[in-house]
Amino acid sequence: MVNLNGIPPRGKRNYYLAIGLEGSANKLGVGIIKHPVLEKHEDSDLSYECDVEILANIRDTYVTPPGEGFLPRDTARHHRNWVVRIIRKALTEAKIDDPTKIDVICFTRGPGMGAPLHCVVIAARTLSLMWDIPLVGVNHCVGHIEMGREITGAKNPVVLYVSGGNTQVIAYSEKRYRIFGETLDIAIGNCLDRFARTLKIPNAPSPGYNIEQLAKQCKNKEKLVVLPYTVKGMDLSMSGILQYIDTLAKDLFKKNLKNKLLFDSRTGEQLVTVEDLCYSLQENLFAMLVEITERAMAHVNSNQVLIVGGVGCNVRLQEMMAQMCKDRSNGQVHATDDRFCIDNGVMIAQAGLLEYRTGHFVKDLSETIVTQKFRTDEVYIAWRE
Amino acid sequence: MSLPHATYTGPKSTHEFEVDPSDPRYQTTEGRTTGASDYVLKQGHQDVDKPSDPKKVDNVNSKTGIDQYTTLSQLRMQLTGLQDDINEYLTEKINHVKKPRNSKQEQEINDLLDGSEET
């Protein structure tokens, strides 16, 4: 039996307030949410129907010049120098004059980059001590899943979690989000971002988005550039694909006429453009994702897919997944837009508040130590049957 | 208002870090060691992530005629300088470890790498 109303809201109110702080990679997000106290939550598995009200969802991204990734030290500096300003902005937007009214402060405990995680948890601890509010440490992946479930209303979907640092196919079973398949090396977003660096295209708003726009401009969609297709059972590998397409791009820029895939050996005519490479890379990678997702759906006998994570807002991925689901009986794809797909504070608040409402929160500051490695299936999901 | 201070303690040395509010290094929120990394700046990065400037109180001090910073801004400036002091001290220690100048230093490095200083 799950009781989401186990801990009453502060001040005998009829709603909960939570603030979420996210900073596991180059996005710094602060979100404030409100959950009404609903009778149906006293004895039910309705954690995807919290009637959440988003009071503020502020995000600031650390952007580097074209061709460059984000270094931990500089990303941490960005978070350190912006966190107070972003929290103030979120409180103003949420019209919260007295922050001590907030029920719980939620922060990302991991997985992610060490230095940025540290900066954000220090802010969370300070607020907790200053306002005397309990803390909840949230697994970043679980944050994505819970936000996706709440926004889309997907009850028990197979989750495809695709971002710059993670690629996992997940399904819920017996109080855990179990990982059915995952990347064996780099994440899909990392693969796309690093290819964007090779192409030296801008990192704003995000490198993956710019690849998607280039892919849309491909004029040769019926003829894909053949790339390695590396599905290994339920897992996938993307580092080899990246290496291969990087070499093709470099040959293209150097005009290496010896490369017969790119140039006609007799006339020297260019056969492939940068747009073609972007399109083929996307098609190849997304086809791999669709394959393992479909297999996971068959395993758990589910007809719902929920796509979360930054790469999840790629429209082409959503289209391909929808096509697969259409071919299966009554399949549905659930996805969210960039407000919730891309890392944000609201998702941390959502997962953290669910945990808080079931009576789990930090009892001692030693429990707030952040960790770079924190697998999705390590979290006990107390708020689901 | 008492001034912030820090102490480094190791098995072989200790170091005290004190703040001198009259020294210009404790009168800014832009630290020398807490800026964007040189590598990123060389790649043409426009630094838009600087810390905010210290805030002045609304009223100018009637006795001195000099602007006063808010208590919190004073603390931020002092901590920035203190952080610089700590970073420089630790960097110096690391450089010392990186470049042995004689056999005695080399021995020290080996001891450090063995983790013997920690025991």
UniProtKB/Swiss-Prot annotation, chain A:
Free-text comment on the cofactor: Binds 1 divalent metal cation per subunit.
Subcellular compartments: Cytoplasm; Nucleus
The keyword Glycoprotein appears for this protein: no
HAMAP family, sorted: Kae1 (MF_01446)
Similarity field: Belongs to the KAE1 / TsaD family.
Binding annotation for a divalent metal cation: H140, H144, Y161, D343
Functional note: Component of the EKC/KEOPS complex that is required for the formation of a threonylcarbamoyl group on adenosine at position 37 (t(6)A37) in tRNAs that read codons beginning with adenine. The complex is probably involved in the transfer of the threonylcarbamoyl moiety of threonylcarbamoyl-AMP (TC-AMP) to the N6 group of A37. KAE1 likely plays a direct catalytic role in this reaction, but requires other protein(s) of the complex to fulfill this activity. The EKC/KEOPS complex also promotes both telomere uncapping and telomere elongation.
A Pfam family: TsaD
GO cellular component, one term: nucleus
Catalytic activity: L-threonylcarbamoyladenylate + adenosine(37) in tRNA = N(6)-L-threonylcarbamoyladenosine(37) in tRNA + AMP + H(+)
Oligomer and partners: Component of the EKC/KEOPS complex composed of at least BUD32, CGI121, GON7, KAE1 and PCC1; the whole complex dimerizes.
UniProt-annotated binding residues for substrate: Y161, V162, S163, G164, G165, D193, G208, E212, N314
Keyword Glycoprotein among UniProt keywords: no
One GO process term, biological-process aspect: tRNA threonylcarbamoyladenosine modification
Cofactor(s) listed in the protein's UniProt record: a divalent metal cation
CDD domains: ASKHA_NBD_OSGEP_like_euk
Keyword line: Activator, Acyltransferase, Cytoplasm, Metal-binding, Nucleus, Transcription, Transcription regulation, Transferase, tRNA processing
Primary localization class, coarse: cytoplasm
Enzyme Commission number, as recorded: 2.3.1.234
MF terms (GO), sorted A to Z: metal ion binding; N(6)-L-threonylcarbamoyladenine synthase activity
Highest taxon, organism lineage: Eukaryota
Coiled coil (UniProt feature): none
Protein name per Swiss-Prot or TrEMBL: tRNA N6-adenosine threonylcarbamoyltransferase
From Swiss-Prot, chain B:
Feature: compositional bias, Acidic residues: 108-119
Region spans: Disordered: 1-62, 97-119
Pfam families: Gon7 (PF08738)
GO biological process, one term: tRNA processing
Bias kind Polar residues: ranges: 25-36
Main location: nucleus
Positions with biased composition (Basic and acidic residues): 44-58
Location within or outside the cell: Nucleus; Chromosome, Telomere
GO cellular component terms attached to this protein's record: chromosome, telomeric region; nucleus
InterPro entries tied to this protein: EKC/KEOPS_Gon7
Keyword annotations of the record: Activator, Chromosome, Nucleus, Telomere, Transcription, Transcription regulation, tRNA processing
Functional note: Component of the EKC/KEOPS complex that is required for the formation of a threonylcarbamoyl group on adenosine at position 37 (t(6)A37) in tRNAs that read codons beginning with adenine. The complex is probably involved in the transfer of the threonylcarbamoyl moiety of threonylcarbamoyl-AMP (TC-AMP) to the N6 group of A37. GON7 likely plays a supporting role to the catalytic subunit KAE1 in the complex. The EKC/KEOPS complex also promotes both telomere uncapping and telomere elongation. The complex is required for efficient recruitment of transcriptional coactivators.
Quaternary organization: Component of the EKC/KEOPS complex composed of at least BUD32, CGI121, GON7, KAE1 and PCC1; the whole complex dimerizes.
Homology family: Belongs to the GON7 family.
UniProt name for this protein: EKC/KEOPS complex subunit GON7
